[in-house]
């Protein structure tokens, strides 16, 4: 024989285990079957960062359109409405050259989300979903370069958080 019986049974056993335990890749779930279309309302921004609500909302819309599991519609035609609040944005120093000279900082967002039906009944909600991204502080205290690094980190963070929210939303159903 070309294969060993031990390997054959091991493969069969693993196949049964993975198919039986609901194993799936992140984001491969579905929102409820009665939700065929969704409206994503621009998120409320409770941070001091201007424009972060548009950035995050657009990144979240991209995640839904990329996957094509549901159609995006206007609020009056959608089966569900996704709303949310960007609660906070924190920036903390994570490494230093000395007590006065930061080398790297971390930006963090936290969001609350709610998916409701057109009547306002909550289908899904979660609070405090967060992610973070590090960025370099420019040498010689060059504020322009540091600010640019922070903006790039904020954009990367927004994309990653939108992906995380999408995966969390679809994994629950």
What residues fall within each predicted segment?
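Surface-exposed short loop/turn segments
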Residues: 67-68, 81-128, 132-149, 163
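A structural "domain/chain start" motif
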Residues: 2-3, 18-62, 67-77, 121, ...
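Bacterial N-terminal signal peptides
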Residues: 9-20
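Individual transmembrane alpha-helices with interfacial aromatic-anchor signatures
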Residues: 146-158
């Amino acid at each position: 024989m070309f294969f060993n019986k031990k390997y054959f049974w091991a493969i069969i056993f693993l196949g049964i285990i993975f198919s039986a335990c609901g194993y799936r890749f992140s984001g491969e779930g579905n929102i409820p079957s009665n939700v065929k279309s969704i409206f994503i309302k621009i998120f409320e921004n409770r941070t001091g960062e201007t424009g972060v609500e548009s950035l995050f909302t657009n990144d979240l819309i991209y995640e839904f359109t990329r996957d094509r599991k549901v159609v995006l519609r206007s609020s009056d035609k959608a089966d569900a409405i996704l709303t949310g609040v960007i609660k906070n944005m924190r920036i903390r120093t994570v490494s230093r050259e000395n007590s006065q000279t930061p080398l790297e900082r971390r930006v963090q967002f936290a969001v609350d989300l709610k998916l409701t039906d057109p009547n306002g009944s909550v289908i899904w909600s979660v609070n405090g979903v967060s992610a973070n991204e590090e960025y370099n502080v420019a040498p010689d205290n060059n504020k322009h370069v540091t600010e640019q690094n922070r903006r790039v980190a904020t954009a990367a963070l927004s994309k990653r958080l939108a992906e995380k929210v999408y995966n969390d939303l679809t994994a629950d159903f």
